[in-house]
Amino acid sequence: MSKSFSNSYKEAGVDITAGYRSVEMMKQHIAKTMVFGNTSDVGGFGGLMELDTEGMEKPVLVSGTDGVGTKLKMAFLLDKHDTVGIDCVAMCVNDIICVGAKPLCFLDYIACGKNNPEKIAMIVKGVADGCVQSESALVGGETAEMPGFYQEDEYDLAGFAVGIVDKKNVLDKNNVKEGDVIIALPSSGVHSNGFSLVRKVFDVESADISKPVSELGGKSIGEVLLTPTKIYVKPVLALLKEVKVKSIAHITGGGFYENIPRSLPEGLGAVIKREDIKVLPIFDLIAKEGNIPERDMFNTFNMGVGMTIIVSKDDIDKTIKVLKENGEDAYVLGTISKSDEGVEIC
């Protein structure tokens, strides 16, 4: 027997009107990124991007995609949604600059149980803020309302970045040699990896994560954990113009032990002195509260280093100078030696 519904799609849980409101509310945020080459209108079927290849011999497009992961649970708990979009952009653009690419454009994907226009607009505000920081145009996106699949007050967030680099300037890890030096770029915190462990350690579902914690300088656990992932685009691009960078690693899931070797050729490893690593207080607290062995910490988290850059030892001073001029408190982290160990922290 058939059933009769009025406004049947809405009764099924999908509110098209709310979707229209979301689009209208996010337009002001998207407009901030229009200066970076976006030539399309919000709501079109495809995002258009004006491509400037002047001065390039063989332009190569570089793409990257990622999400924010279970860090989103922190946003749900704190009901703060205007910064996770920065995380989404950061996770993508920080990856593509590892090959020397300049970000061009970005697209986001939001899937939710119920479309709350105000919340969606806040998420997109964060995405737009991240695009401004990375000088990327927000050329498109999708908001999928999926009742029965996600809880009403929860969502997932992912993104896709496209960049460009002249083929002759693509960074090649095979240029790394014994005796080269690793430069560290500090992270802003946990960034967007390891949150399944972090949430368990701090029991965030039950504990009060809004109260000040002395070990964190009076900040709350929630505030520190929700700090957006740092975007390294501007300082790295500035450095690429001044110094012959050999290789870059974005320190994400897998920490030092998984990511630094990705920037090294076979037969070479990184030697890092433990005392030289400027570990942030949040990681000391995680290790203490979770009774986590140090190797596991370095195999899970960035430990205060969000990106590593390998240069010749002759370029140390200039590299640090350029990075500091662009807001990065960079420092020498370690050296490259003949090894099959990948990373040795001693």
How would you label these PLM feature ranges?
Residues 156, 169-218:
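Short, acidic (Asp/Glu-rich) active-site segment that either coordinates a divalent metal cofactor
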Residues 72-74, 195-196, 331:
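A short, polar/proline- and glycine-enriched secondary-structure boundary/capping micro-motif
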Residues 23, 121-124, 195:
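Hydrophobic face of alpha-helices
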